[in-house]
A protein has these predicted regions:
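A membrane-interface helix-boundary motif in multi-pass transporters
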Residues: 90-92, 121-123, 182-202, 389-407
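Flexible cytoplasmic inter-helical loops of multi-pass small-molecule transporters
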Residues: 215-233, 422-424
């Protein structure tokens, strides 16, 4: 059957999506690439923790960096779901909200520039205020952005798209991470950090303008719903879907499975005297690993099982933590970061496609996306804080062991409890 006849059989909205699919796919990849180019200069698992490490030796405060980002990303998402369930388009809110996850990097650049003039406690307070702003800005952006993307990309391509976008993100982030390592090594501190954060803001601004070109069809008008009715509907869906509840349990476990990730670099710096330049190379290995694995794991999830791919990532998380626990030289950190890249794809990228697939229709999609991120949010901040506290009081080994055990429980739950949701 010709493509013209197929388009004639589709609804106007479906035909619009098919007509603009290639354009939106490419725009999504460029958006991810430029976003990654920016984040590589200000990584939440390397560059920003290193900046905080220059101000304090507290593993607890260092662990707060990814904790705040994760909590900010996850916590607000359900609170935007009620509005989104009634929205006819998601792009306007996405563009307004995402400003708040980009501008704070300019704030970090200014803060780093004035480090010589301010006390360390003041710098730390200002830094964490910027991280809170950025984290919650990302969280309020996440649900409308995910809904927009999963609306303009057909469901059977969700895993492939998110995998390829993640590859673009991490590929360019790997390039900027190497550059950031050189900047940290060659430019005097704190100007080196200020320059990194300024470059992050510059490329995130380019990403913003690319994102604005997304072509989104207008959905049919939807009835207004009282807020109490929305929360009642959310609770009803949660009670009725035992498989989704099991998935939420896995999402909570995944926060503890990845608890050790924030401390690998700091541990290597403290125990094996890793240089800032070497740290940049390790981050590049981590990101390039995700470049290779993200499209493969995303496509594999579309063809086989997103649940199965997540379980493989859980095993990767466990192995990386065990190797970090047993490492006796810097050479061990090459496989550690490769295994971490497998785990990160499974913990962060694959669940986006999997959580959307639980929804029965487009109206339920914001609710499922919101619940899959907001409900695990307390664990997202508790896990790194617990890991940092354990590292401060009992040593990094305990943090790594607990992370490995959590990852094994996550893998077992995915194989024994969670089932693949039916494709809709």
């Amino acid at each position: 059957m010709s493509s013209g006849k197929i388009l004639n059989m589709l609804s106007p909205k479906e035909a619009y999506i098919q007509n603009h699919l290639r354009f939106n796919f490419i725009i999504g990849l460029f958006d991810g690439g430029f976003f990654g180019l920016g984040i590589g200069f200000a990584s939440f698992t390397a560059i920003i923790p290193l900046f905080v490490h220059h101000l304090t030796d507290s593993a607890l405060l260092i662990g707060l960096v990814p904790a705040i980002h994760n909590m900010g990303w996850q916590l607000p998402q359900l609170f935007t779901a009620g509005w989104l369930a009634r929205a006819r388009t998601f792009k306007p809110l996405t563009l307004w909200m995402t400003i708040n996850e980009r501008v704070p990097f300019l704030g970090l650049a200014i803060i780093a520039f004035f480090v010589p003039l301010l006390t360390k406690p003041t710098i730390l307070i200002l830094t964490f205020l910027m991280l809170l702003w950025q984290g919650f800005g990302a969280g309020f952006t996440a649900n409308p952005w995910t809904n927009m993307v999963t609306k303009v990309i057909p469901q059977e391509m969700h895993g492939t798209f998110f995998g390829m976008q993640s590859a673009a993100f991490n590929g360019f982030a790997g390039i900027s991470a190497i550059t950031a390592g050189l900047i940290l090594d060659k430019v005097v501190s704190p100007l080196n950090f200020s320059l990194c954060f300024l470059l992050a803001f510059f490329f995130l601004t380019i990403s913003y303008f690319v994102l604005s070109f997304t072509r989104e069809p207008v959905s049919h008008s939807r009835e207004e719903e009282h807020p109490l009715a929305f929360w009642g509907k959310s609770l009803t869906l949660l009670k009725a879907d035992s498989n989704f509840r099991a998935f939420l349990g896995v999402r909570i476990l995944s926060q503890f499975a990845g608890m050790a990730f924030a401390f690998y670099l700091i541990y290597a710096v403290q125990k094996f005297k890793m240089s800032d330049a070497a740290a940049g190379i390790m981050v590049a290995i981590l990101l390039i690993g995700q470049v290779v694995l993200s499209p493969l794991m995303g496509r594999w999830g579309d063809r086989w099982s997103h649940r199965g791919v997540m379980s493989i990532g859980a095993i990767g998380a466990a192995l990386s933590a065990v190797l970090a626990w047993k490492a006796n030289s810097l050479g061990w950190f090459y496989p550690i970061f490769i295994l971490e890249s497998v785990a990160i794809v499974a913990i962060w990228t694959i669940p986006i496609a999997l959580s959307v697939s639980f929804a029965g229709n487009e109206n339920e999609r914001p609710i499922y996306i919101g619940m899959s991120n907001t409900i695990p949010a307390p664990a997202a901040i508790l896990a790194p804080v617990l890991g940092g506290w354990l590292a401060d009081t009992s040593g990094f080994d305990i943090t790594f062991i607990l992370s490995a055990i959590s990852a094994l429980f996550m893998a077992a739950a995915l194989w024994l409890v969670v089932k693949d949701p039916a494709k809709k």
